[in-house]
Amino acid sequence: MSKLHVVDHPLIQHKLAFIRDKETGSKTFRELVNEVSMLMAYEVTRELQTEEYEVETPISTAKTRILSGKKLGLVPILRAGLGMVESVRNLIPAARVGHIGVYRDPETLQPVEYYCKLPQDIHERELIVLDPMLATGGSAKASIQFIKDRGGTNIRFMCINAAPEGVEELQKAHPDVDIWTCAVDEKLNEKAYIVPGLGDAGDRLFGTK
């Protein structure tokens, strides 16, 4: 079974309070999602491999450490996942960015892929899938499967807010994919919104309804 990591750093919890607040406008909401994503990225990447590296300082030589493992890839789930990409990529400029979009077929209720553009060397990369919310788990589950179908193997899922139902669904479908979130809330309501949640992240990020 995959691990669930709840990142409860005080700075993250402070910013999450205002992300949840319905009075927070779109501009501030975007900024807060950016900031929280950057803070979360420190934890999500904590176990990246490093190797010893010697540099010349202005005074002498120093033995330091640099990244040495697999290259990284970021895969936001459209559209809300776009709000998390910039800050994470600022920390990891060499990371390649793919995009994946899914929608639910109104008749079959099954996830359908409508867009997918991933790095060609996806099988050589450690991948972080980004989406602010993990509600039912349907989009995350399907997106990760589409990524696996194209050769992705080393995958982590990063969200800001999750419902227990979504966590359970994702863990059941992909027990090899660890989940990072800032909060696991009470439940989903009858409309599949997280309670208390933060509303529709895509609408709040981009000012749409």
From Swiss-Prot:
Protein family per UniProt: Belongs to the UPRTase family.
The protein, known as: Uracil phosphoribosyltransferase
Pfam family, one: UPRTase
Phosphoprotein found in the keyword field: no
InterPro entries membership: PRibTrfase_dom, PRTase-like, Upp_B, UPRTase/APRTase, Ura_phspho_trans
Manner of cofactor binding, per the entry note: Binds 1 Mg(2+) ion per subunit. The magnesium is bound as Mg-PRPP.
Positions with a binding annotation for 5-phospho-alpha-D-ribose 1-diphosphate: R79, R104, D131, P132, M133, L134, A135, T136, G137, G138, S139, D200
Alphabetical GO biological process terms: UMP salvage; uracil salvage
Group of enzyme by EC: transferase
Gene name linked to the record: upp
Function as written in the Swiss-Prot or TrEMBL entry: Catalyzes the conversion of uracil and 5-phospho-alpha-D-ribose 1-diphosphate (PRPP) to UMP and diphosphate.
EC number(s) reported in the record: 2.4.2.9
Pathways involved: Pyrimidine metabolism; UMP biosynthesis via salvage pathway; UMP from uracil: step 1/1
Keywords per UniProt: Allosteric enzyme, Glycosyltransferase, GTP-binding, Magnesium, Nucleotide-binding, Transferase
Native organism: Natranaerobius thermophilus (strain ATCC BAA-1301 / DSM 18059 / JW/NM-WN-LF)
Enzymatic reactions: UMP + diphosphate = 5-phospho-alpha-D-ribose 1-diphosphate + uracil
Regulation: Allosterically activated by GTP.
GO molecular function: GTP binding; magnesium ion binding; uracil phosphoribosyltransferase activity
Keyword Nucleotide-binding: yes
Named cofactor requirement(s): Mg(2+)
Binding site for uracil: I194, G199, D200, A201
